[in-house]
Amino acid sequence: MRILFCTGGSEKSENAIRATASLINQLKADATVLSVGPSHDLIGRMLGAEFRMSEVTVDTDRAVTKNLSKYADNGVKILKEAGINAVVKIARGEIADEILREAETGAYDFIVMAAKGKPGDRHLLGSVTRKVLAKAKIPVYVV
């Protein structure tokens, strides 16, 4: 069995990993912790035309990569504490699309993700979670 855990570094994401780990530690599953952030091009567009090829964009891109690695490493640590071995995957692009791409190419049995990652969202499910639920070809466990 292969499980894809998704994290954006939020407390809710970590709680989803923790809650699921306690349920699946007897399955001896292979686990991957995926963290997705904006692509280099998107960072440039967000910062504006004058920053697209600047040092600011490169520095921002490095900071994003560092944070994504930290988020995924935290997820792996939670899983290891529950006796589950996991590997880290980092992706850059539109978050839901990258989760769906990894789910399909990695031959996972199901996806685990938090209901929403951003605090203050008034909806029951966040936009990324809604998109993954609508388009995933495998079960999605939402915590």
List the predicted regions and their residue ranges.
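Conserved beta-strand positions in the Rossmann-like core of class I SAM-dependent methyltransferases
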Residues: T32, V87, Y141
